[in-house]
């Protein structure tokens, strides 16, 4: 986690009003600019007008962070929902995604594979179990959370 993400996450989290929750903070290059994405959610999903209201709350708060973690050139701010295909980065994200269809990319191969897609059967805080289709049969693959390079929920067609 880079410094901007950690600083913003720690600063913003207590200011997010209930029933909303801070899902993730992302700091990435977008075209020639830097973009700060603040992903918020609530049980049952979040509406676009709610993200607009949260943006109006969050934007002035970011200006009060001291020392200022942002580059002098400025940045773009996006307050959004994590979406249907949401990133899974933290243990609580995986715990909340049990029963959902997910994609997992690993740092190193497990069973000669580096990517898996299937239903997240369980998560115990350290290991996830994914039910994958291997040709014509299902099998459970146990994956240590520390081995996960990238993961997200997927829409199953």
Curated annotation (Swiss-Prot):
The keyword Endoplasmic reticulum does not apply. One of its GO terms (biological process) is ribosomal small subunit assembly. Keywords: Cytoplasm, Ribosome biogenesis. GO terms for cellular component: cytosol. It is found in: Cytoplasm. Belongs to the RimP family. Required for maturation of 30S ribosomal subunits. This is Ribosome maturation factor RimP. The lineage of its organism: Bacteria, Bacillati, Bacillota, Bacilli, Lactobacillales.
């Amino acid at each position: 986690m880079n410094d901007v993400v950690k600083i913003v996450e720690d600063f913003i989290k207590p200011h997010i009003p209930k029933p909303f929750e801070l899902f993730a903070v992302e700091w990435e290059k977008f075209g020639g600019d830097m973009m700060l994405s603040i992903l918020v959610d609530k049980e049952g999903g979040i509406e676009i007008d709610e993200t607009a209201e949260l943006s109006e709350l969050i934007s002035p708060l970011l200006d009060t962070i001291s020392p200022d973690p942002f580059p002098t050139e400025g940045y773009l701010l996006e307050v959004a929902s994590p979406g249907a295909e949401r990133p899974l980065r933290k243990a609580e994200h995986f715990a909340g995604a049990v029963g959902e269809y997910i994609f997992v990319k690993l740092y190193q191969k497990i069973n000669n594979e580096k990517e898996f897609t299937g239903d997240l059967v369980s998560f115990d805080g350290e290991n996830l179990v994914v039910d994958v289709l291997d040709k014509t049969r299902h099998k459970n693959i146990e994956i240590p959370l520390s081995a996960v390079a990238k993961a997200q929920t997927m829409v199953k067609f």
